[in-house]
């Protein structure tokens, strides 16, 4: 995307400057003709950046605006359109719409498996990650574990996708009270997270610390859990704001640890 109308918005997003990325992307989108490729991509960046600021309802509305444009430009079965559907679905789970997210991610994963090429393979992993998160959120931890392991077996790269799948696996194990197994997965995720370049780590700010805090609380290692939860909360608050799903989860965990929330 270097040298294109969306290059600045993309660079701002990758630098974690989400408010600036959103503003730039929306400016580009408004300036482009109807059904223009760069206008469509700008809408996608705007949706991602809005969600990263914890404004999940607005982000979903932006995805809803972008989806028909992507369909007209690229076609319903193109990997970019399918990726947009996956991203949109995962925004739903940030709003508590877990069953809808699960169903849509499953549909995208099926479509991706029918496709060919590395983009479709990455998309299948991304959609399965959305399913794993939604299953965990519904308390269906054994199903989430099975799907996370299947996805990790199919996706061998040590990249951000493997990171989020491992975090989902840790969450599923913790949900089954298999805390030592979950701790091992959290340690693996931490090692992988540290190996990634900065721009790939930013979207998962606080996620590894939150995973550790949740597991340690399950193991009744309360002082360690509280320290990790506080680090996660402060990092998420600084990066994403108070209303982001991960910030809220970290804050809720801190309240549970402190006994102010059941």
Residue positions per predicted region:
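Intrinsic-disorder-linked linear interaction elements in eukaryotic regulatory proteins
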Residues: 1-262
């Amino acid at each position: 995307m270097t040298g294109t109308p969306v290059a600045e918005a993309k660079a701002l997003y990758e630098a974690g400057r989400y408010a600036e990325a959103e503003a730039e992307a929306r400016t580009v989108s408004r300036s482009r003709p109807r059904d223009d490729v760069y206008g469509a991509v700008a809408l996608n960046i705007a949706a991602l950046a809005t969600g990263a600021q914890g404004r999940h309802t607005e982000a979903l509305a932006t995805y809803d605006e972008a989806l028909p444009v992507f369909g007209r430009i690229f076609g319903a079965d193109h990997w970019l359109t399918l990726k947009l559907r996956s991203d949109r679905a995962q925004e739903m789970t940030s709003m508590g719409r877990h069953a809808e997210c699960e169903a849509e991610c499953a549909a995208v994963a099926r479509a991706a498996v029918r496709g060919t090429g590395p983009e479709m393979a990455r998309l299948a992993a991304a959609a399965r990650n959305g399913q794993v998160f939604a299953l965990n959120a519904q308390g269906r931890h054994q199903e989430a574990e099975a799907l996370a392991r299947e996805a990790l077996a199919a996706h061998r790269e040590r990249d951000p996708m493997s990171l989020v799948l491992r975090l989902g696996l840790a969450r599923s194990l913790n949900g089954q009270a298999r805390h030592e197994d979950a701790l091992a997965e959290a340690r693996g995720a931490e090692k992988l997270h540290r190996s990634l370049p900065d721009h790939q780590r930013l979207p998962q700010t606080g996620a590894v610390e939150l995973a550790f805090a949740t597991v340690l609380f399950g193991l009744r290692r309360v002082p360690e859990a509280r320290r990790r939860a506080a680090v996660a909360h402060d990092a998420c608050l600084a990066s994403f704001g108070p209303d982001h799903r991960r910030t809220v989860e970290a804050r809720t965990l801190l309240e549970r640890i402190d006994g102010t929330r059941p």
